[in-house]
């Protein structure tokens, strides 16, 4: 996934060691007239370009993956530069991926930052004294942390608190979703250029799930890479990903957690059916017990983890448990994997977090209690609710940033099939009478079409 830092401060700072964890394979820093640009590489394909990459008077950094890249160009960043030179600031419409793209123009002394529709790759701006910083991680955190407490057993008020792209004070800012921001190094002014790079079509006219299903499979397959690891549960988001990969004869690893906060939460009948269905292509391991010397609650002074304190501080200081860190350790030790496949986004984009049991339609009792501030019925006029609470902000922002922070601590890359521009657009196009049949209508149909029990 890689990490970056751009600053006018020539000295090392506290987050440098954190950034190196996210890009363990190579590091490069260049000085461009007092602007220091650093890129830490996590190599996935082995076909990597030293970044920042200079073309004419501009320096480019790409964080993330471009899935529609022209492979003859040799690297994703070349493709991005080509599209930028062809289309200017509208070039992101020609990119399909999970990315952050940065351009420093030494002639105008400006920095431009472009995010994908959900800003799946973090970028923070902050200013301390006379120094400015752009980086993957913030220099400081809000008092109570960015991620809140561990969510599985928390109340609605805590678990589904609204986490927005937000400016916490006058010197600290997270570069938001779907946007182009420009920073003038001389004046110190950061300004939005475009806060809606990608415009969604809210016309609900498709009376079947065919195009949506095809776009789901495309989203999964273009994110598949050799030796990737799926975090697999019996849930409605990761299970269809596993079956799609198996249907297309794609080999993958998977990991299922049955201990800690997940103990007793899986529908084992559904999980076993999915494992049987995907068995030829799926190398699965189950985490049923933690090693006796593994501390599930992190204490820096008492920590028995083999990982450095820098990693512990980065990942676990604001979390109630560290089991998700253990799962990432296993990705490396069991599979030597560098890419994590997740079902993240299935709730945020396709369900708006209703609380109804899987067997009930959205109209059951006319409301929900899991997200009382949200809507329970998809309306005829989608513009009345779009973008809904968790489409960009809320849990979408919280979980994207949380999972990226967790994975970068181990030099791993997340790939999120549900945060796909075409796939999300196809969902928006589906007529409301289909959306309102049942929560996660696509995922349930995908399981039932393959003879898999829908989890209760």
Question: What do the predicted segments below correspond to?
Answer:
Residues 1-292, 299, 338:
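Cysteine-centered catalytic environments shared across enzyme families
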Residues 456:
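Conserved PLP cofactor-binding pocket of PLP-dependent enzymes
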Residues 6-13, 108-112, 120, 128-129, ...:
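ATP-dependent adenylate-handling active sites, centered on carboxylate activation for C-N bond formation
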